[in-house]
Amino acid sequence: MYSVTTAGGSVPVIDDLDAAIIGLLHAEPRIGVLEASRRLNVARGTVQARLDRLHARGVVTGYGPDVDPETIGFGVTAFVTLEIRQVGGHDPVTERLALIPEILEVHTITGAGDMLCRVVARTNADLQRVIDAIVTAEGVARASTVIALATPVRYRVLPLVRAAARPRSGAGHSPA
């Protein structure tokens, strides 16, 4: 991995070895560095150095299990757009929303609303309870909710990682 300087500053760039390491870890999160180096046909130290850099730069942020909310009883997914009172800003609202376990993500957005939340619930009636908890959070002025009927493309980053990878420099060698 290396950096490219743009008008916005230095942007980390990954190469095809970084992408291969990330892809392997995505497919087999419990694989060890030694086994990864064998499968990728590179030195163990190279894989470890690349992983250390990917972690240090925030490209790889963890190895936790991916949990499908539906498999633990939360079969309803909805997106809630919030308009907030501008007096206190986003931070106090975000802190309150973070206390609601059914909120999986909160994004500040442009457009008609100020924040977008991805939430889950057990049933539609339970979704009403979650929405009630959201709209009673101090600073929330209005909420608009849409329920997801299906998720034909789940959250994924591996295609993006592959698209972002640049070919390694040199004849089969890359900087560790």
Question: Residues of each region from the PLM?
Answer:
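A compositional/biophysical signature of low hydrophobicity enriched in polar/charged and small residues
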Residues: 1-176
